[in-house]
Protein backbone atom coordinates (compact mmCIF):
# COMPACT_ATOMS: atom_id res chain seq x y z
CA UNK A 1 0.00 0.00 0.00
CA UNK A 2 1.24 3.49 -0.89
CA UNK A 3 0.22 6.45 1.29
CA UNK A 4 0.89 10.14 0.70
CA UNK A 5 1.59 11.71 4.07
CA UNK A 6 0.83 15.42 4.38
CA UNK A 7 3.84 16.68 6.32
CA UNK A 8 3.67 19.82 8.44
CA UNK A 9 7.29 19.60 9.65
CA UNK A 10 10.23 17.23 10.10
CA UNK A 11 9.69 16.41 13.81
CA UNK A 12 6.06 15.45 13.20
CA UNK A 13 7.06 13.17 10.31
CA UNK A 14 9.41 10.97 12.35
CA UNK A 15 6.92 8.83 14.26
CA UNK A 16 4.13 8.38 11.66
CA UNK A 17 6.68 7.47 8.99
CA UNK A 18 8.36 4.92 11.29
CA UNK A 19 5.00 3.40 12.29
CA UNK A 20 3.83 3.03 8.71
CA UNK A 21 7.18 1.59 7.61
CA UNK A 22 6.93 -1.06 10.36
CA UNK A 23 3.56 -2.07 8.90
CA UNK A 24 5.00 -2.41 5.40
CA UNK A 25 3.35 0.76 4.13
CA UNK A 26 5.27 2.74 1.50
CA UNK A 27 4.81 6.32 2.68
CA UNK A 28 6.00 9.46 0.94
CA UNK A 29 5.77 12.96 2.35
CA UNK A 30 3.86 15.88 0.88
CA UNK A 31 5.01 19.29 2.11
CA UNK A 32 2.15 21.69 1.44
CA UNK A 33 1.70 24.33 4.11
CA UNK A 34 0.56 27.74 2.83
CA UNK A 35 -0.37 28.64 6.42
CA UNK A 36 3.21 28.83 7.68
CA UNK A 37 4.23 32.36 8.61
CA UNK A 38 6.57 34.12 8.05
CA UNK A 39 8.48 32.94 4.98
CA UNK A 40 11.62 32.50 7.10
CA UNK A 41 9.74 30.02 9.31
CA UNK A 42 8.59 28.16 6.20
CA UNK A 43 12.19 27.92 5.00
CA UNK A 44 13.42 26.64 8.40
CA UNK A 45 10.80 23.87 8.33
CA UNK A 46 11.47 23.02 4.70
CA UNK A 47 15.23 22.77 5.28
CA UNK A 48 14.71 20.54 8.33
CA UNK A 49 12.52 18.26 6.22
CA UNK A 50 15.15 18.14 3.48
CA UNK A 51 17.73 17.13 6.10
CA UNK A 52 15.50 14.44 7.61
CA UNK A 53 14.44 13.03 4.25
CA UNK A 54 18.07 12.85 3.14
CA UNK A 55 19.15 11.10 6.33
CA UNK A 56 16.28 8.59 6.30
CA UNK A 57 15.84 8.31 2.52
CA UNK A 58 12.21 9.49 2.61
CA UNK A 59 10.60 10.58 -0.65
CA UNK A 60 9.04 14.03 -0.32
CA UNK A 61 6.94 16.00 -2.79
CA UNK A 62 7.34 19.75 -2.22
CA UNK A 63 4.34 21.80 -3.28
CA UNK A 64 4.65 25.48 -4.10
CA UNK A 65 4.52 27.84 -1.12
CA UNK A 66 1.69 30.30 -1.68
CA UNK A 67 0.42 31.92 1.55
CA UNK A 68 -2.25 33.75 -0.45
CA UNK A 69 -4.11 30.40 -0.73
CA UNK A 70 -4.32 30.23 3.06
CA UNK A 71 -5.34 33.85 3.59
CA UNK A 72 -8.00 33.61 0.87
CA UNK A 73 -9.42 30.44 2.46
CA UNK A 74 -9.69 31.95 5.95
CA UNK A 75 -10.87 35.40 4.87
CA UNK A 76 -13.41 36.77 7.37
CA UNK A 77 -12.66 33.84 9.70
CA UNK A 78 -9.32 35.03 11.05
CA UNK A 79 -10.47 35.08 14.67
CA UNK A 80 -13.03 32.32 14.33
CA UNK A 81 -12.60 28.84 15.79
CA UNK A 82 -13.29 27.61 12.23
CA UNK A 83 -9.94 28.98 11.07
CA UNK A 84 -7.99 25.85 12.06
CA UNK A 85 -10.50 23.48 10.45
CA UNK A 86 -10.33 25.49 7.23
CA UNK A 87 -6.54 25.32 7.33
CA UNK A 88 -6.54 21.54 7.87
CA UNK A 89 -9.11 21.15 5.12
CA UNK A 90 -7.18 23.02 2.42
CA UNK A 91 -4.01 21.09 3.21
CA UNK A 92 -5.73 17.70 3.28
CA UNK A 93 -7.68 18.44 0.09
CA UNK A 94 -4.47 19.30 -1.75
CA UNK A 95 -2.83 16.17 -0.33
CA UNK A 96 -5.70 13.97 -1.52
CA UNK A 97 -5.47 15.49 -5.00
CA UNK A 98 -1.71 14.97 -5.11
CA UNK A 99 -2.16 11.38 -3.91
CA UNK A 100 -4.57 10.64 -6.76
CA UNK A 101 -2.37 12.38 -9.34
CA UNK A 102 0.71 10.44 -8.22
CA UNK A 103 -0.78 6.96 -7.94
CA UNK A 104 -1.10 6.63 -4.16
CA UNK A 105 -3.74 4.40 -2.59
CA UNK A 106 -4.48 6.65 0.37
CA UNK A 107 -3.52 9.90 2.08
CA UNK A 108 -3.03 10.96 5.69
CA UNK A 109 -1.33 13.71 7.72
CA UNK A 110 1.35 14.21 10.33
CA UNK A 111 -1.10 16.53 12.10
CA UNK A 112 -2.37 13.32 13.73
CA UNK A 113 0.82 13.10 15.83
CA UNK A 114 0.29 16.42 17.60
CA UNK A 115 -1.45 16.56 20.96
CA UNK A 116 -2.14 20.23 20.18
CA UNK A 117 -4.38 19.54 17.15
CA UNK A 118 -8.04 18.51 17.22
CA UNK A 119 -7.73 14.84 16.29
CA UNK A 120 -11.48 14.25 15.87
CA UNK A 121 -11.97 17.21 13.54
CA UNK A 122 -8.94 16.26 11.44
CA UNK A 123 -10.25 12.69 11.15
CA UNK A 124 -13.69 13.98 10.15
CA UNK A 125 -12.20 16.32 7.53
CA UNK A 126 -9.96 13.56 6.17
CA UNK A 127 -12.86 11.14 5.82
CA UNK A 128 -15.05 13.78 4.14
CA UNK A 129 -12.35 14.64 1.62
CA UNK A 130 -11.72 10.93 1.00
CA UNK A 131 -15.37 10.47 0.03
CA UNK A 132 -15.34 13.56 -2.19
CA UNK A 133 -12.05 12.71 -3.89
CA UNK A 134 -12.70 8.95 -4.02
CA UNK A 135 -9.42 8.00 -2.36
CA UNK A 136 -8.89 6.43 1.05
CA UNK A 137 -7.96 8.38 4.17
CA UNK A 138 -5.63 6.52 6.51
CA UNK A 139 -6.37 7.29 10.14
CA UNK A 140 -4.11 6.38 13.02
CA UNK A 141 -3.70 8.15 16.34
CA UNK A 142 0.03 8.86 16.24
CA UNK A 143 0.04 11.01 19.41
CA UNK A 144 1.76 8.37 21.58
CA UNK A 145 4.95 9.02 19.58
CA UNK A 146 4.94 12.82 19.78
CA UNK A 147 7.45 13.28 22.63
CA UNK A 148 9.78 10.59 21.32
CA UNK A 149 9.75 12.13 17.85
CA UNK A 150 10.58 15.59 19.15
CA UNK A 151 13.37 14.21 21.32
CA UNK A 152 14.77 12.44 18.25
CA UNK A 153 14.50 15.61 16.16
CA UNK A 154 16.39 17.62 18.78
CA UNK A 155 19.03 14.90 19.08
CA UNK A 156 19.46 14.98 15.29
CA UNK A 157 19.79 18.78 15.32
CA UNK A 158 16.60 19.34 13.33
CA UNK A 159 14.69 22.58 13.62
CA UNK A 160 11.80 22.27 16.09
CA UNK A 161 9.25 25.05 15.83
CA UNK A 162 7.51 26.72 18.76
CA UNK A 163 4.06 27.19 17.21
CA UNK A 164 1.64 25.52 14.80
CA UNK A 165 2.61 27.64 11.82
CA UNK A 166 0.17 30.43 11.04
CA UNK A 167 0.60 34.05 12.05
CA UNK A 168 -2.20 33.69 14.60
CA UNK A 169 -0.56 30.77 16.39
CA UNK A 170 2.73 32.68 16.25
CA UNK A 171 1.11 35.69 17.93
CA UNK A 172 -0.42 33.43 20.59
CA UNK A 173 2.98 31.83 21.25
CA UNK A 174 4.66 35.25 21.56
CA UNK A 175 1.93 36.36 23.98
CA UNK A 176 2.35 33.20 26.11
CA UNK A 177 6.12 33.63 26.35
CA UNK A 178 6.02 37.24 27.56
What are these regions (language model features)?
Residues 1-178:
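Nucleotide-activated chemistry modules centered on ATP-dependent adenylation/adenylyltransferase
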Amino acid sequence: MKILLHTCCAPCLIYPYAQMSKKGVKASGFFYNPNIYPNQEYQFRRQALIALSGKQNIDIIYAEYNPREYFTAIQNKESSPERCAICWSIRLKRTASAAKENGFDMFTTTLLVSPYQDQDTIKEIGNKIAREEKIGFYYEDFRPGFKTAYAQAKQDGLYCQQYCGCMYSNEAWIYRTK
